[in-house]
Structures are given as C-alpha cells and as structure tokens.
C-alpha cells in the first residue's frame, strides 16, 4: 500500500488545503493520504485558532489519517519543523511527501536544497552567522537565487527537501503550485475564489 504524506497545520482547514490534499492523492497515485499536523501550537509556538481535535475532524474530510507532529517541531524554526516532520513521516513509512510551493518546480527546489546543505558546511556560512546576518540573507548571498528564497512556501519546501536528503533519502517528493493568496499577502485575491 502506497502513501502520500502532507505536513500541515490546518490553522484552520480551508479550501486550499482541500485542493492540496485531493491533488496530492491524485498525482501521487497512492492509496492512503496521511496528514502530519501540528497540535494545539503551530509553527514557532503560536496557539492554533481551533483545538487540534476540531482541526483533525475538518482534515478527515480530505485525508485518511491525521498524526500529530511532535510539539518540538511546532515550536521550532522551519528547518527543525521540517526535520521533525520528515522523521515522523519516515517512522510512518510514508512513500511520498507532497507540499505546496509558489514555484512548483521540484527540480529547482531540490537543486537549491542540495546547494544549501553544502553551503551550511562552508566556513564562510558559519562566519556570517556569527556576524549576525540572518539565515535567509546568507543563503541568498551564497546561492545568488533569491527569487526562490523570497516565498515562504518555497522556503519551507526546501527545508522538507533538505531533511529528506539527510534523513529519508528513499522518500519521494511532490510539489503542488500554491494558488490564490500568498502566505503573507494582506489583500485578498478574489479571482481564485
């Protein structure tokens, strides 16, 4: 039995999540869809809008199983969030991880993930961190490809891909183009409703 995993917060569950879950199952041609979902706290420790059981109930309209992401993942940066989520997916023997991204270019995101793993080992990277430069700024300077690093779902997708390369190299990835309003967009785009 083949499974696709979705690393989620569903804070709250909406039509975009339903679209992502449905398309992920269709494109991955899997039998089971598993959501690895944050509990009562979402990324970086923000309290969830709805209790985890209510969000699970909503999610089960689109997925077959919801497993709670360990709390340490929810309280962490995107790289640690991704690492904990991928390790959880590996424990569940998930075959494919599907995530949304603004670019929808798995090839470009995988290439950048590989570059970033190499750059993080470089002495210049560690020196720039000591100088107080931010992680995204250093990476955009080193990669010279800051367009992919300007979009929050691309950044999170790259974190998933890095974690997969390091901890679950047998796992496959699938990315779905994020449609509609962007993560930090302050104006609602009515053309996608």
Sequence positions of predicted segments:
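Active-site cores that bind ATP or allylic diphosphates and position pyrophosphate for catalysis
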Residues: 69-193
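Short, high-confidence coil segments that cap the C-terminus of an alpha-helix
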Residues: 27-31, 63, 94
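A glycine-rich helix N-cap at a beta->alpha junction
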Residues: 57-71
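N-terminal catalytic cores of NTP/NDP-binding nucleotidyl/phosphoryl-transfer enzymes
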Residues: 1-55
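Non-catalytic positions within long, well-ordered alpha-helices that form the structural scaffold/packing
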Residues: 25-26, 60, 86-90
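Divalent metal-coordination and catalytic microenvironments
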Residues: 14, 59, 161
């Amino acid at each position: 039995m083949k499974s696709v995993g979705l690393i989620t917060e569903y804070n709250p569950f909406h039509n975009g999540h339903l679209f992502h879950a449905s398309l992920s199952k269709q494109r991955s041609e899997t039998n089971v869809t598993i959501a690895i979902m944050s509990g009562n706290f979402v990324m970086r420790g923000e309290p969830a809008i709805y209790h985890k059981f209510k969000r699970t109930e909503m999610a089960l309209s689109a997925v077959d199983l919801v497993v709670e992401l360990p709390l340490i993942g929810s309280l962490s940066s995107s790289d640690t969030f991704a690492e904990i989520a991928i390790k959880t997916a590996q424990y569940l023997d998930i075959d494919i991880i599907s995530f949304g991204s603004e670019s929808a270019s798995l090839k470009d995101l995988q290439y950048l993930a590989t570059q970033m793993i190499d750059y993080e080992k470089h002495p210049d990277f560690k020196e720039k961190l000591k100088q107080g430069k931010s992680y995204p700024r250093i990476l955009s300077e080193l990669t010279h490809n800051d367009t992919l690093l300007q979009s929050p779902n691309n950044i999170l997708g790259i974190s998933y891909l890095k974690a997969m390369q390091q901890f679950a190299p047998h796992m496959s990835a699938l990315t779905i183009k994020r449609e509609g309003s962007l993560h930090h967009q302050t104006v609602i785009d009515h053309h996608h409703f």
